[in-house]
A protein has these predicted regions:
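Crotonase-fold acyl-CoA enzyme core
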Residues: 1-90
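C-terminal alpha-helix plus adjacent terminal tail
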Residues: 52-53, 84-157
């Protein structure tokens, strides 16, 4: 969901990832190359590994990261600044950025991502994973992550 947001703020130690790419291709991964470049997007898509909040900022996936304890306060400060700008100006400012993204081909990228998602939904691997999910969500997700030792199967400190 964060991939499609205008602004993203995370905790330094956040764990951001998309493990579902190990078993099926999700629709919102089409934003990854636009946000963090081809190589970082490719690594996340091919491994399903997570990145920290600090890495998310350095990759361009998030705007800023803060200590977990101060995250809410810092985001509220930013929201208060955003709220001081008249809404009609904010609408134009957002439109200006979105128009530039469209000029750079993002609309075609979204369309291509949607086509890839349609193909992926009919792949053998996705169909098998959907059957596993229908049989038991926790078991299917644990099976997906077990081989990698992360997400659901990661050892807790």
């Amino acid at each position: 969901m964060a991939a499609s947001c205008d602004l993203v703020y995370v905790a330094n130690d956040a764990e951001i990832g998309y493990p579902v790419v190990r078993s099926m291709s999700p629709p919102d991964n089409q934003f990854f190359p636009w946000l963090m470049g081809m190589r970082n997007a490719m690594e996340m898509m091919l491994t399903g590994e997570s990145i920290s909040g600090e890495e998310a900022v350095s990759y361009g996936f998030a705007n800023k990261c803060f200590d977990k304890e101060s995250l809410s306060d810092e985001v509220i400060k930013i929201a208060e600044k955003v709220a001081k700008v008249p809404s009609d100006i904010q609408a134009i400012n957002k439109r200006a950025v979105h128009r530039q993204m469209e000029a750079m081909g993002m609309r075609n990228g979204i369309r291509a991502g949607t086509e890839m998602q349609a193909l992926a939904m009919h792949s053998k691997s996705t169909q098998e994973h959907l059957k596993e999910l229908a049989s038991g969500l926790k078991e299917a997700l644990t099976k997906r992550d077990k081989e990698f030792g992360d997400y659901r199967t990661k050892e807790k400190d």
